Amino acid sequence: MSIVSDLSRWLAGGPVAFAERRVRCASPSGLHRVAYTEWGEPENPNVLVCVHGLTRNGRDFDELARTLAADYRVICPDVVGRGRSDWLRDPSGYTFPQYASDMMVLLARLNVASVHWLGTSMGGLIGMWIASQEDSPITRLVLNDVGPLISVASLLRIGEYVGQAPKFDTYEDAEKYVRLVSQPFGPLSDAQWRHLTEFSLQRLPDGRLAMR
């Protein structure tokens, strides 16, 4: 899988405009790039921003974005340190203020007056913070798998795998891991599990696979 810029692809169900882009952001440790996918017509003022959970990436929304692209310009970023976005030089920089700052840079890049926001878990928390600000560009906020309060049980479960860096000798082993840690996603089809897995992996110099 390789990065493709400004690409229109023929996808299932007809032609859907699709592009992979990046926007440059700043942190106390320097500059970094945030990657995002854009679905639908770039001139469509009806914009939906979809932001993923703590250990996931923007490609989780591919199926939804493809479905909504006829009516929305759908933007799906990889939060810094995930997916195809850069990593921060300082590991202590992965904080919600940094994530929110990056997303505000992205929203400015879109050059639109308002957006709808769909946030899963961490993406919902980022959305709540931005939506709470005066003159926020978010006009509608949809929360998935998150709310104003987070249970202790949920935090303990996340703590079981966050920060781990597992390596896999085979794709099958990697998919088993993704299915295990992502069980709360629900009864997905085999094709959906394959999609989540493929866009979660990177090939290491030694030939093994690791999570992005």
Regions found by a protein language model. Name each.
Residues 1-48, 70-72:
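Alpha/beta-hydrolase fold catalytic core
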Residues 113-152:
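Conserved hydrolase catalytic core segment
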Residues 138-140, 144-173:
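A catalytic-pocket lid/entrance helix-loop region that shapes and gates access to the active site
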Residues 176-212:
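Alpha/beta-hydrolase
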Residues 55, 79-83, 148:
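Alpha/beta-hydrolase active-site loop signature
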Residues 28-30, 37, 63-66, 76-118:
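Active-site loop/oxyanion-hole signature of alpha/beta-hydrolase fold enzymes
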Residues 53-63, 74:
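Serine-hydrolase catalytic-loop signature spanning alpha/beta hydrolases and amidase-signature enzymes
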